[in-house]
């Protein structure tokens, strides 16, 4: 009976995280056998330049926008404002360009804004050239 009385009168113990003797639990996610990143294996070949045909290196950068993806607006010519002369040039009024909306540049039509041929929605095809 004395043993049960001493158990009920003891103060509550601190949480297990505050005890120095509590074991530390660490959980790790299981490693998947299938990686998201694929590895590419390459094989070394002999450096035989005579067997290789010299191919012309084609630039994939867009020639119209020079790889920028945007060209100067054709409507406002890069001003951002379409200006109109009134009273024989004495008064000039302008409104925001409707094509570029004042940004002074529009997307390149050749590369569709990608900056290189064969990007995004381009219809560039190697076999056609």
From Swiss-Prot:
InterPro entries: HSP_DnaJ_Cys-rich_dom_sf. Disulfide bonds: none annotated. GO terms for biological process: chaperone-mediated protein folding; ribulose bisphosphate carboxylase complex assembly. SUPFAM superfamilies: DnaJ/Hsp40 cysteine-rich domain (SSF57938). Disruption phenotype: Mu-active bsd2-m1 mutants are specifically disrupted C4 differentiation in bundle sheath cells with reduced levels of bundle sheath cell-specific photosynthetic enzymes and aberrant bundle sheath chloroplast structure and altered RuBisCo complex formation. Ectopic accumulation of RuBisCo large subunit (RbcL) in mesophyll cells. Zn(2+) 1 binds at residues 62, 65, 108, 111. It is found in: Plastid, Chloroplast stroma. Residues 1-43 form a transit peptide. Expressed in shoot tissues, in both bundle sheath and mesophyll cells. Zn(2+) 2 binds at residues 73, 76, 97, 100. Keywords: Chaperone, Chloroplast, Metal-binding, Plastid, Repeat, Transit peptide, Zinc, Zinc-finger. Zn(2+) 3 binds at residues 68, 105. The keyword Transit peptide applies. GO terms for cellular component: chloroplast stroma; protein folding chaperone complex. One of its GO terms (molecular function) is protein folding chaperone. A zinc finger (CR-type) spans 49-123. Signal peptide: none annotated. The keyword Cytoplasm does not apply. Interacts with the RuBisCo large subunit (RbcL) assembled as an intermediate complex made of eight RbcL and eight BSD2 subunits. Belongs to the BSD2 chaperone family. Chloroplast chaperone required for RuBisCo complex biogenesis and translational regulation of the RuBisCo large subunit (RbcL). Stabilizes an end-state assembly intermediate of eight RbcL subunits until the small subunits (RBCSs) become available to produce a complete stable RuBisCo complex containing eight small and eight large subunits. Involved in the differentiation of bundle sheath cells, especially chloroplast structure. This is Protein BUNDLE SHEATH DEFECTIVE 2, chloroplastic. It comes from Zea mays. The lineage of its organism: Eukaryota, Viridiplantae, Streptophyta, Embryophyta, Tracheophyta. The gene is BSD2.
């Amino acid at each position: 009976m004395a043993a049960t009385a001493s158990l009920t009168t003891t103060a509550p113990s601190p949480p297990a995280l505050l005890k120095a003797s509590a074991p530390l639990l660490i959980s790790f996610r299981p490693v998947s056998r299938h990686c998201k990143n694929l590895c590419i294996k390459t094989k070394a070949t002999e450096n035989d330049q005579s067997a290789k045909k010299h191919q012309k290196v084609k630039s994939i950068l867009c020639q119209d926008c020079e790889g920028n993806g945007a060209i100067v607006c054709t409507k406002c010519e890069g001003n951002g404002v379409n200006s109109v002369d009134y009273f024989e040039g004495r008064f000039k009024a302008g409104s925001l360009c409707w094509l570029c909306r004042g940004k002074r540049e529009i997307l390149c039509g050749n590369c569709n804004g990608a900056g290189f041929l064969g990007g995004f929605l381009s219809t560039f095809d190697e076999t056609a050239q």
